[in-house]
């Protein structure tokens, strides 16, 4: 099965369905609240959607406690990762290794040099202060997956704040991917949202990548 939900290709090849853990879909099916929202939206299906996503951004603003003008909506997190890279056009970027492969793939599209900070088994593959030391004036963009994919490890909030301060000092953007953070019962403890007054911080959240 190809990563990312090609269930039809799997069915055509093997004649049956598989449990696909590479796609963020629920085995419980479509929630009734979502089905209801779809039915209610059908009356406006003859119109183009609002390009500024005003209603959605207002709802997200209330739910997340973030000013509406700080929210940009896209077609999944991957879309926004590419948009950020295309807008910033970094010459050199820093990612952890291992991590979500889409960061490097997006950076490759603008010819960006990708520097990889290796997560060590001796630290249980968790990021350390050494990650901050890897940021210098040559780095334009830093990606941090919180929690990291595929290790599942979290960066301590104090470390994230220190990393952001380092990025600010060096003129780099810190992009924190929190797409899976809400799976944690204490997600609010780990989010970087309290740091959003910084112009150097971008947070990704999504229903799916």
In which residue ranges do the predicted regions lie?
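Conserved beta-strand elements of the Class I
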Residues: 19, 72, 92-94
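Short glycine-rich anion-binding loops that position phosphate/pyrophosphate groups of nucleotides
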Residues: 24-27, 77-78, 100, 146-150, ...
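Glycine/Thr-rich phosphate-binding loops of Rossmann-like dinucleotide-binding domains
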Residues: 29-31, 81-82, 103-104, 151-152, ...
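Short loop-beta-helix segment that forms the pyridoxal 5′-phosphate
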Residues: 49, 61-83
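N-terminal "arm"/small-domain region of PLP-dependent enzymes with the aminotransferase-like
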Residues: 1-47
């Amino acid at each position: 099965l190809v990563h990312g939900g090609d269930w039809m290709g799997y069915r055509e090849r093997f004649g049956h369905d598989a449990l696909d853990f590479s796609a963020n879909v629920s085995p419980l099916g479509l929630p009734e609240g979502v089905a209801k929202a779809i039915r209610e939206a059908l009356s406006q299906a003859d119109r183009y959607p609002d390009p500024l996503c005003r209603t959605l951004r207002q709802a997200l603003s209330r739910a997340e406690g973030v000013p509406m003008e700080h929210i940009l909506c896209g077609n999944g997190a991957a879309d926004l990762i590419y948009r950020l890279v295309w807008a910033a056009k970094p010459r050199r970027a820093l990612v952890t290794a291992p991590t979500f492969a889409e960061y490097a793939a997006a950076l490759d599209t603008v010819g960006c040099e990708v520097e990889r900070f290796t997560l060590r088994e001796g630290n249980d593959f968790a990021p350390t202060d050494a990650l901050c030391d890897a940021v210098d004036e040559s780095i334009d963009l830093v990606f941090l997956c919180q929690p990291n994919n595929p290790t599942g490890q979290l960066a301590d909030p104090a470390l994230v704040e220190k990393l952001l301060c380092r990025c600010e000092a060096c003129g780099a953007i810190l992009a924190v991917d929190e797409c899976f953070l809400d799976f944690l019962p204490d997600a609010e403890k780990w989010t970087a949202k309290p740091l959003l007054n910084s112009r150097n911080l971008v947070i990704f959240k999504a229903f799916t990548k």
